[in-house]
């Protein structure tokens, strides 16, 4: 047995209203050789579930989702989110707080839909799965600074949030340039273990061949696809190397195996708890 397909979903966290068009979610699927099988966008949970049904390999798929999947805390921040800041704060990476009062619960709804469809949520505390239809939570920022292959040794790339040092008037141009550099680093994963071959699919190839847009809506469109590809590659990294290259944030939960709210995150030695990262 083994996992043959790795899926990444950059999920739009908020639910759409009756009169509101759902926001886009980025979706991507790669195989064990890094070939991009499919990538693009969906709108709403129904489209995302339909895409998964067409893209997953039955009995051999691992999906990583960038969205809170298990939210059991009435207030405050989930422990796994707190640990993001504790372990990766030096690289200027932190996580938004999620609790049962948060309006953005699309990840919880996706988990419920997936479980109803035969998928199994895996909190990662038992190591990588060896088969089945399995999904877990990840956070692309931890991949960017936790995977040494990408070269972000000092701090995260500024492709999302404007740093205070960048004037608002210059932000769109600075962001587009930073995004282009990040795509260049992702293109370098061709020789990584596991690899990611951006040139293997027209959608991901376009990231490399065309300049990053400055217009806000166009940029968000591209950003969602980038994050989905990072999620898929993180799933492949976890499957290939397990705890040797990744850590499970929130692993101290007292919940039964497979039920804890966790984030599976690539980690350098200095980002791990047992190396003084707290």
What is the predicted role of each segment?
Residues 1-7, 11-278:
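RNase H-like (RuvC/DEDD) metal-dependent nuclease/polynucleotide-processing core
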């Amino acid at each position: 047995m083994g996992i043959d397909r790795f899926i990444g979903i950059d999920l739009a966290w908020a639910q759409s209203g009756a009169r509101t068009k759902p926001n886009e979610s980025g979706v991507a699927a790669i195989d064990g050789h890094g070939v991009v099988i499919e990538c693009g966008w969906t709108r709403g949970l129904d489209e995302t579930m339909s895409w998964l049904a067409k893209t997953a390999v039955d009995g051999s798929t691992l999906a990583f989702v960038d969205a809170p999947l298990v939210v059991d805390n009435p207030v405050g921040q989930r422990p796994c989110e707190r640990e993001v800041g504790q372990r990766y704060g030096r690289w200027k990476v932190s996580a938004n707080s999620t609790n049962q009062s948060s309006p953005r619960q699309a990840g919880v709804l996706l988990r419920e839909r997936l479980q109803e469809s035969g998928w199994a949520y895996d909190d990662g505390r038992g190591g990588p799965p060896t088969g089945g239809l399995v999904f877990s939570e990840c956070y692309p920022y931890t991949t960017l600074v936790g995977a040494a292959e990408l070269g972000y040794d000092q701090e995260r790339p500024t492709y999302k949030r404007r740093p205070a040092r960048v004037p608002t008037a210059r932000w769109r141009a600075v962001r587009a340039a930073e995004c282009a550099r990040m795509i260049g680093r992702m293109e370098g994963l061709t020789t990584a273990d596991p690899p990611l071959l951006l040139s293997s699919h027209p959608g991901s190839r376009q990231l490399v061949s065309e300049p990053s847009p400055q217009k806000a809506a166009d940029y968000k469109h591209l950003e969602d696809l980038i994050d989905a590809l990072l999620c898929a590659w993180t799933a492949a990294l976890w499957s290939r190397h397990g705890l040797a290259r990744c850590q499970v944030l929130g692993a101290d939960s007292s919940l039964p195996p497979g039920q804890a709210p966790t984030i599976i995150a690539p980690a350098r030695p200095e980002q791990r708890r047992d190396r003084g990262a707290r």
